[in-house]
């Protein structure tokens, strides 16, 4: 390796395995064009992977057979949010699936964001949807579990909550500190809050 490629690789080797990075993380090394070429070459050599256009990873290795572990779509979404300094929360079926409220595995992830709307096409064929929302108070939750419960109830509605789903939600609510619950219950729409309180008090 020579020049820009060596400097890019040296920086990547200093990262933890599993780290996700982007072309502009190397702007101090060279032009975007030269960095892009360096990353393409490192990918060809099997040293890094590209889970989506413009998104790269220094992959973790599994066992003695050196099997590469591809980063999860969730970790890619979180890395993008951190890079762009925006907030994201799972919503819809994605939130319900994370809580175990549906047995259907979600192939495409959906997030609400206070950033721009966009779609990320992953090399695996899956997609990550970021939908902009002006309802900024939904990012004010103290507790992530409360945030996801409210998001899931909004899509399932009261009619979609059978006894088993309410039992699962109740189990999750037991992990929420009372102080967090008292603050967060004021954030969702009134009808969602009423359902959460009823399950909490059950």
Name each model feature, range by range:
Residues 2-80:
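Short beta-edge/loop segments at beta->alpha junctions of small alpha/beta modules
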Residues 35, 91-92, 145:
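Amphipathic alpha-helical interface surfaces
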Residues 51-54, 87-122, 127:
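Short gly/ser-rich loop at a beta-strand->alpha-helix junction or flexible surface loop bordering the NTP-binding
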Residues 53, 61, 93, 133-135:
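Histidine- and/or cysteine-centered catalytic micro-motif in compact active-site loops
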Residues 78, 127-135:
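Short amphipathic alpha-helical segments and their helix-coil junctions
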Residues 83:
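Basic nucleic-acid-binding interfaces
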Residues 133-202:
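Hydrophobic alpha-helical interaction segments
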């Amino acid at each position: 390796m020579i020049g820009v490629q060596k400097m890019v690789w040296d920086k990547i080797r200093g990262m933890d395995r599993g780290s996700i990075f982007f072309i502009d993380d190397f702007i101090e090394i060279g032009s975007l064009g030269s960095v892009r070429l360096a990353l393409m070459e490192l990918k060809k050599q099997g040293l890094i992977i590209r889970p989506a256009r413009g998104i790269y990873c220094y992959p973790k290795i599994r066992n003695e057979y050196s099997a590469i572990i591809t980063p999860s779509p969730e970790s890619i979404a979180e890395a993008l949010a951190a890079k762009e300094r925006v907030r994201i929360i799972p919503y819809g079926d994605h939130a319900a699936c994370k809580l175990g409220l549906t047995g259907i595995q979600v192939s495409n992830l959906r997030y609400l964001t206070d950033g721009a709307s966009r779609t990320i096409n992953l090399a695996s064929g899956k997609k990550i949807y970021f939908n902009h929302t002006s309802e900024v108070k939904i990012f004010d939750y103290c507790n992530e579990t409360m945030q996801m419960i409210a998001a899931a109830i909004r899509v399932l509605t009261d009619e979609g909550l059978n006894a088993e789903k309410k039992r699962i939600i109740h189990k999750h609510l037991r992990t929420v500190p009372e102080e967090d619950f008292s603050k967060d219950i004021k954030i969702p729409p009134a009808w969602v809050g009423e359902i959460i309180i009823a399950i909490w008090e059950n």
